[in-house]
Amino acid sequence: MQVKSLISSVALWGCAFTVANPIIGWGIGDVDKKAPMPPGFGETKPIPGDSPLKMCDIAEGQLLEITKLDLVPNPPKRGSKLVIKASGEIFETIEEGAYVDVEVRLGYIKLLTQTYDLCEILEDNDVDGLTCPIKKGKYDNLSKDVDIPQEVPPGKYLVTARAYTNDDDLITCITGEVYFPPPGI
């Protein structure tokens, strides 16, 4: 359940949640509805705050503007707690049927291409009380703790998450790299 909780938060508050979750739990989720593009696809811009994550596909209209995203610690460390803090604004109510397409690569190797039901994840997990429908408006200082297992393999992970409404309108696109060094470094 922790994996799904993180993926839902990705859609709303940043790819930070996919940084840990797909790495520790790939293979969990629903059948793909729409395959995500490779990480870094389209134009990107940094998300304000302390994280390695960027908004992607910025030329497309998006229903979520992430105004701040912090990862503590940044970069994340295996065997420790990752605290994700985010603020943003949703411009349209998000209804049942919303989903998140996630792709995780280790270098050029694709580890995960998965679709997650956003509302189901929110119902099953505590993401600061968010449930569908998610009303339009500003959301400040949302926070989620994630335990990153010691067993996360070393390497540079490239993550892309695209969230869509039930009508396939883009909620957000987030991409980024996270490096986990070999143990002892």
Swiss-Prot record:
Keyword Membrane set for record = no
**Which InterPro entries does the record associate with it?**
GM2-AP_sf (IPR036846), Ig_E-set (IPR014756), ML_dom (IPR003172), ML_PG-PI_TP (IPR033917), NPC2-like (IPR039670)
Which CDD domains does the UniProt entry name for this protein? PG-PI_TP
Annotated GO biological processes are: intracellular sterol transport
> What GO molecular function annotations does the UniProt record carry, in alphabetical order?
phosphatidylcholine binding; phosphatidylinositol binding; phosphatidylserine binding; sterol binding
**Residue span of the signal peptide, if any?**
1-20
Q: What does this protein do?
A: Catalyzes the intermembrane transfer of phosphatidylglycerol and phosphatidylinositol.
User: Which PANTHER family does its entry note?
Assistant: NIEMANN PICK TYPE C2 PROTEIN NPC2-RELATED, PHOSPHATIDYLGLYCEROL_PHOSPHATIDYLINOSITOL TRANSFER PROTEIN
What family, per the record?
A: Belongs to the NPC2 family.
Protein name in UniProt: Phosphatidylglycerol/phosphatidylinositol transfer protein
Q: Which organism is it from?
A: Candida glabrata (strain ATCC 2001 / BCRC 20586 / JCM 3761 / NBRC 0622 / NRRL Y-65 / CBS 138)
Question: Corresponding gene?
Answer: NPC2
